[in-house]
UniProtKB/Swiss-Prot annotation:
UniProt subunit comment: Homohexamer. Forms an RuvA(8)-RuvB(12)-Holliday junction (HJ) complex. HJ DNA is sandwiched between 2 RuvA tetramers; dsDNA enters through RuvA and exits via RuvB. An RuvB hexamer assembles on each DNA strand where it exits the tetramer. Each RuvB hexamer is contacted by two RuvA subunits (via domain III) on 2 adjacent RuvB subunits; this complex drives branch migration. In the full resolvosome a probable DNA-RuvA(4)-RuvB(12)-RuvC(2) complex forms which resolves the HJ.
Subcellular location: Cytoplasm
Name of the protein: Holliday junction branch migration complex subunit RuvB 2
Taxonomic superkingdom: Bacteria
GO biological process, one term: DNA recombination
Reactions that this protein is recorded to catalyse: ATP + H2O = ADP + phosphate + H(+)
Region listing for Head domain (RuvB-H), in residue ranges: 288-370
Region of interest: Large ATPase domain (RuvB-L): 13-214
Function in brief: The RuvA-RuvB-RuvC complex processes Holliday junction (HJ) DNA during genetic recombination and DNA repair, while the RuvA-RuvB complex plays an important role in the rescue of blocked DNA replication forks via replication fork reversal (RFR). RuvA specifically binds to HJ cruciform DNA, conferring on it an open structure. The RuvB hexamer acts as an ATP-dependent pump, pulling dsDNA into and through the RuvAB complex. RuvB forms 2 homohexamers on either side of HJ DNA bound by 1 or 2 RuvA tetramers; 4 subunits per hexamer contact DNA at a time.
SUPFAM superfamilies xref list: P-loop containing nucleoside triphosphate hydrolases (SSF52540), Winged helix' DNA-binding domain (SSF46785)
Length: 370
């Protein structure tokens, strides 16, 4: 016996509607994830084009004026003596140009540049492979140097201080240490967590320099330079709009420039003006102070659940669902820099400036925009 459905032709059953609704939610989440990633200071694997935007000389390098002056003196002195640069350690939040500065130094010295990361140096043979092939004046750059394994770090001590590689030959009672002379080289380390470095390693660097967040006018110049390299039409007002939402970070500024360029090509005539930049970045949920949804969530949770603080890092992480290290290394530095968050002995506290930006009033515990 045939069974005839009473549903109208073409009508969706509840299962189909649920599948489509789930698909829309997944698409929405994916779109938000893409937008949220715009403000991550770490490099994305897809950002290979960033290499073409890097300055090659100190003269091309924009910002970090005091650091450039110190480094230019070090370069001139080393050249005059015919010696390699002293070992250098750069620290600061991600995305500020530590790798770029290291590459520029090598170029200015006319030296070969070798780059690696601490997590890639798992065993002594990994670091030994780099050290034995370095020639006079070569530069070895180790990113995330605070993550070096202890046994690898200890191999660096005589290499940095005496240009000697000590290796153990044999096992047990027959084991002996053999020293291999090394060419005089320059080690440049970079870290976002200078406090995580051991004193013996930190003390072996001739210079320890901090990279600061960039000023809006410096970022605007970086955006203008990158736009020229990308053959993108932009005026100064458009560059300034992108710059002020870039969290003081060149990597983010270049990333936002590329997304605004896409928006200008699809929704406009290809030229980036202040209005076009503002419209694009609002679409990507980047507000005028460079805050994204996660930044606002962190601040809002502090206000609405804890009266503005103080709140401990672990508590913040548990309530927001974010990793404590991510909060401390990705979100907090910029919120501290712009005066929206304070660290106290008892925990994190939201400032009046943050309350005003989020739309809170003194009379109401809830945000005006909620």
């Amino acid at each position: 016996m045939a069974i005839i459905s009473s549903r109208a032709a073409g009508a969706e059953d509840p299962g189909q509607r649920q599948q489509k609704s789930s698909a829309r939610r997944r698409e929405s989440k994916l779109a938000f994830a893409r937008a949220e990633g715009l403000l991550q200071p770490q490099a994305h694997p897809s950002e290979a084009q960033e290499e073409s935007l890097r300055p090659r000389t100190l003269a091309e390098y924009i910002g970090q004026t005091e650091l450039k002056e110190v480094l230019s003196i070090a370069i001139a002195a080393a050249r005059a003596r015919g010696e390699p640069l002293d070992h250098l350690l750069f620290y600061g939040p991600p995305g500020l140009g530590k790798t770029t500065v290291a590459a520029v130094l090598a170029a200015e010295m006319g030296s070969r540049f070798y780059m690696t990361t601490a997590p890639a140096l798992e065993s002594p043979r990994d670091i030994a492979g780099y050290l034995v092939r370095l020639k006079q004046g070569d530069v070895l750059f180790i990113d995330e140097i605070h993550r070096l394994p202890k046994v690898t770090e200890e191999l660096l001590y005589p290499a940095m201080e005496d240009f000697r590689l000590d290796i153990t030959v044999g096992k047990g009672r027959s084991a002996r240490i053999t020293s291999i002379p090394l060419e005089r080289f320059t080690l440049i380390g970079a870290t976002t967590r200078i406090g995580a470095l051991t004193s013996p390693l930190r003390d072996r660097f001739g210079q320890v320099q901090r990279l600061r967040f960039y000023e809006p006018h410096e970022l605007a110049e970086i955006v203008l330079r990158s736009a020229r390299l990308l053959n993108t039409s932009i005026d100064r007002a458009g560059a300034e709009e992108i710059a002020r939402r870039s969290r003081g970070t060149p990597r983010i500024a270049n990333r936002l420039l590329k997304r605004v360029r896409d928006y200008a090509q699809v929704r406009g005539d290809g030229h980036i003006s202040r209005e076009v930049a503002a419209a694009a970045l609002e679409l990507f949920q980047v507000d005028p102070m460079g805050l994204d949804w996660t930044d606002r969530k962190l601040l809002t949770v502090l206000v609405e659940q804890f009266g503005g603080g103080p709140v401990g890092l672990e508590t913040m992480a548990a309530v927001t669902g974010e990793d404590p290290q991510t909060i401390e290394e990705v979100y907090e530095p910029y919120l501290l820099q712009i005066g929206y968050l304070q660290r106290t002995p008892r925990g994190r506290v939201v400032t009046p400036a943050a309350l005003q930006h989020l739309g809170y009033t003194a009379q109401s515990p809830l945000p005006v925009w909620s």
